[in-house]
C-alpha cells in the first residue's frame, strides 16, 4: 500500500526494544476518495476473479468425470489446473488483504498476523508466476523435443512440485522482516500502528538486494523465460515449415495441420502478453519508489492506485485466456 510505504520511508529512527517511532510529522495516512475507489475496484475484481477461476475448476472437473475411466488428463490441462489454483490462491489472499488494509489504513491484527499474512501474500504471488514458467517450459519442450517429453511422464509433475516448493521457500523471509511499528506523539500511547519492514535490515543494501531478488523472481526471470520459450517455439515451427510443410506433424496427425499445438502456442503468447500488461505498471511504480521514494509526493495518489490495480487484472484475465483456448 503506497501510503504505508511512504510512512515507513519517512521515519529514520526506531527503538530496538518496542519498535516505537516518534511522530515527527503531524499528517497520518487516511482513507481518501481515490482510496475508496481503489477498495471498490479491488473487491469487484476479487469477485470477478473468484468466479472465473472457480468456474474453470468446476468445468475442468466435470470434463474430467466425463472422460473414460482410467484415462488421465492431458499434460496441458493438468498445468492449467495448477495455474488456476495458484490464481485462486492469489485472489483469495492478496485482494481481500489489500482491500481491508486500505480501509483500515493502519494495521490492527497484531504482529503474528502481520508476519503470517505478509508471508502468504508473497507466496500467493510467487505461485502463479512460477506456474507460468512451468507452462512455457512445457510447451517449448513439447514442440522442440516432443519425443523426450512423452518419454518423461513425471517431468510435468516434477516441474509443478518444484514451482510450489520454491514459492513456499522464497516467501520465507517475510516471516522475519515484517513487524509491527507504533507511532507516538509523546503525549501517551501510540496513535498509529503499522505492519512494515522498518529496521529489519542491518544495512540499506540488504533491503535493496532482497527487493531486487523478489522483483527478479516475480517478474524479470519469468518474463525472460516466457520470451525465450515462445521464441524457440516460433523458430522451431518456422524452420520446419520452411523445410517442408508436410513434415509438421506435432499433433501426431499424419495429414492435418497441428491445430492443437498451434492453439497452445497462441495461448502461451496470450499468457505472456497478459503477464506483461498487468504487472509492468505495478513493478515500474515499485522500482521508481526504490530509487526515488519522494516520487510518491510528486505522483498523484489516484495514479498510484491505478497502477497498483493493474496487477489484480492478471488472475482475472488468465481464466478467460485458457478457457477460450483450451476447452
From Swiss-Prot:
The cross-references to Gene3D superfamilies, in alphabetical order and at most eight, read: Rhodopsin 7-helix transmembrane proteins
Q: How does it sit in the membrane?
A: Multi-pass membrane protein
Give the protein family: Belongs to the G-protein coupled receptor 1 family.
Organism expressing this protein natively = Rattus norvegicus (Rat)
Signal peptide residues on this chain, from the entry's feature table: none
- Induction profile: Expression oscillates in a diurnal and melatonin-dependent fashion in the preoptic area (POA) region in the hypothalamus, with maximal expression attained during the dark phase of the light/dark cycle.
Question: What is this protein identified as?
Answer: Gonadotropin-releasing hormone receptor
Q: What is its main location?
A: membrane
Sorted alphabetically, which Pfam families does this protein's record hold? Answer: 7tm_1
GO biological process per UniProt: cellular response to hormone stimulus; circadian rhythm; G protein-coupled receptor signaling pathway; negative regulation of cell population proliferation
Asked if the Swiss-Prot or TrEMBL record annotates the protein with the keyword tRNA processing, the reply is no
Question: What superkingdom heads the lineage?
Answer: Eukaryota
- One of the record's GO cellular component terms: plasma membrane
Does Glycoprotein appear among the keywords? yes
Which parts of the sequence lie on the Cytoplasmic side of the lipid bilayer? 59-77, 138-164, 232-280, 326-327
Q: List the disulfide bonds.
A: 114-195
InterPro entries listed in its UniProt record: GPCR_Rhodpsn, GPCR_Rhodpsn_7TM, GphnRH_fam_rcpt
Purpose of the protein:
Receptor for gonadotropin releasing hormone (GnRH) that mediates the action of GnRH to stimulate the secretion of the gonadotropic hormones luteinizing hormone (LH) and follicle-stimulating hormone (FSH). This receptor mediates its action by association with G-proteins that activate a phosphatidylinositol-calcium second messenger system.
Going by the UniProt record, its keywords in alphabetical order are: Cell membrane, Disulfide bond, G-protein coupled receptor, Glycoprotein, Membrane, Receptor, Transducer, Transmembrane, Transmembrane helix
Select a single GO molecular function from the record's annotations and give it.
gonadotropin-releasing hormone receptor activity
Side of membrane Extracellular, spans: 1-38, 98-115, 185-211, 300-305
Q: Any transmembrane segments, and where?
A: 39-58, 78-97, 116-137, 165-184, 212-231, 281-299, 306-325
Compartmental location: Cell membrane
Amino acid at each position: 500500500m503506497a501510503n504505508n510505504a511512504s510512512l515507513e520511508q519517512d521515519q529514520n529512527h526506531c527503538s530496538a526494544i518496542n519498535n516505537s517511532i516518534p511522530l515527527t510529522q503531524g499528517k497520518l495516512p487516511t482513507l481518501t476518495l481515490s482510496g475508496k475507489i481503489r477498495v471498490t475496484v479491488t473487491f469487484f475484481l476479487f469477485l470477478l476473479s473468484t468466479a472465473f477461476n472457480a468456474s474453470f475448476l468446476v468445468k475442468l472437473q466435470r470434463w474430467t468425470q466425463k472422460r473414460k475411466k482410467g484415462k488421465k488428463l492431458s499434460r496441458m490441462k493438468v498445468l492449467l489446473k495448477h495455474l488456476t489454483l495458484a490464481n485462486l490462491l492469489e485472489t483469495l489472499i492478496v485482494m481481500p488483504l489489500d482491500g481491508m488494509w486500505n480501509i483500515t489504513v493502519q494495521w490492527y491484527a497484531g504482529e503474528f498476523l502481520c508476519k503470517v499474512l505478509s508471508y502468504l501474500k508473497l507466496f500467493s504471488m510467487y505461485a502463479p508466476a512460477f506456474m507460468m514458467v512451468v507452462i512455457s517450459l512445457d510447451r517449448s519442450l513439447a514442440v522442440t523435443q516432443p519425443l523426450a517429453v512423452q518419454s518423461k511422464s513425471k517431468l510435468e509433475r516434477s516441474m509443478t512440485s518444484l514451482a510450489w516448493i520454491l514459492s513456499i521457500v522464497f516467501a520465507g523471509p517475510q516471516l522475519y522482516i515484517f513487524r509491527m511499528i507504533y507511532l507516538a506523539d509523546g503525549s501517551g500511547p501510540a496513535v498509529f500502528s503499522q505492519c512494515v519492514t522498518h529496521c529489519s535490515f542491518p544495512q540499506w543494501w540488504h533491503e535493496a538486494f532482497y527487493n531486487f531478488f523478489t522483483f527478479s523472481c516475480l517478474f524479470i526471470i519469468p518474463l525472460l523465460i516466457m520470451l525465450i520459450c515462445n521464441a524457440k517455439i516460433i523458430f522451431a515451427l518456422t524452420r520446419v515449415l520452411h523445410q517442408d510443410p508436410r513434415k509438421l506433424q506435432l499433433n501426431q496427425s499424419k495429414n492435418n495441420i497441428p491445430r492443437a499445438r498451434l492453439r497452445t502456442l497462441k495461448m502461451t503468447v496470450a499468457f505472456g502478453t497478459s503477464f506483461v500488461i498487468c504487472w509492468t505498471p505495478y513493478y515500474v511504480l515499485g522500482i521508481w519508489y526504490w530509487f526515488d521514494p519522494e516520487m510518491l509526493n510528486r505522483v498523484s495518489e489516484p495514479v498510484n492506485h491505478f497502477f497498483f490495480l493493474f496487477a489484480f487484472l492478471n488472475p482475472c484475465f488468465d481464466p478467460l485466456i485458457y478457457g477460450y483456448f483450451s476447452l
